[in-house]
Amino acid sequence: MSTATPAQNKSNDSIRYAIEAKYHFGIVVPHHTSMAYLINDYARGGEINIIRQRYKKDLWESYLNRPETGIGMWFSTFGRPDIYGEGIAIYPYINFRIFEWQKLSARYRVALGLGYASNPFDYEKNTYNTVFGSKLNAYVGFGVLLRYPIGNYFSLTSSFSLNHMSNGSSRKPNNGINTATLTFGAVYELNQFQEPTYHNTSPPPSKAREILATISAG
């Protein structure tokens, strides 16, 4: 399958940088019965992301349709501040292109990082919190994003996001928490940038020999 990679000239050796800020509003998904009774508010928060998009030739991004990569910070309430507290996460992420139609573009995001829960389970002070057994947690985020430029430096952005935090049962209790949110925000371009011209090409063929065998029964 062919993918778009930059034409081989000096103008393509460039990197785009931008900063993105978004507001989150949504729900905490009550995947345990106790959570359904305790949650009494929406999930609210935000995120800030540093965006990098590389156009240098012979990079892995060239064969994946030039995805955006970067580092971000996410913050959210969890529907019951006195029990579940709030969460903060720092993560690297990658945004893959889905389609582009005129000025509108769509991407999907995968993020994985470290999360912090402000009010975990405590035998004396917070026995209702069966979601977080520790302050340190893993963070996983997925999203589908839309973006529309309004000038040379600004773009409007919106997305549907799924966010998860848990400690992987390294410390009990650990039901983990999931939020489903809609986001609205803006992107500001940090450098004046024009996307290079691309030719269709394919990744170089692998010289390694590959053997695949499967066995099934029943």
Description of each model-found segment:
Residues R66-Y116:
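Gram-negative (and chloroplast) outer-membrane scaffold detector with strong preference
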Residues Q8-Y55, N191-G218:
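Short glycine/proline- and aromatic-enriched beta-strand/turn motifs that initiate or cap beta-hairpins
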Residues T33-A36, F78-P81, N126-F132, N167-N174:
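Extracellular loop and loop/strand-boundary signature of outer-membrane beta-barrel proteins
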Residues R52-R54, F96-I98, L146-Y148, Y188-L190:
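Residue-level signature of outer-membrane beta-barrel architecture
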Residues I19-Y23, T69-I71, Y108-L112, V144, ...:
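Membrane-embedded beta-strand positions of outer-membrane beta-barrel proteins
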Residues K57-W60, Q102-A106, I150-L156, Q192-E195:
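Repeated loop/turn-to-beta-strand initiation elements of outer-membrane beta-barrel proteins
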Residues I15, N40-G46, N65, Y84-I90, ...:
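Residues that define the transmembrane beta-barrel architecture of outer-membrane proteins
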Residues Y23-V29, R52-R54, M73-G79, L112-P120, ...:
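Transmembrane beta-strands of outer-membrane beta-barrel pores
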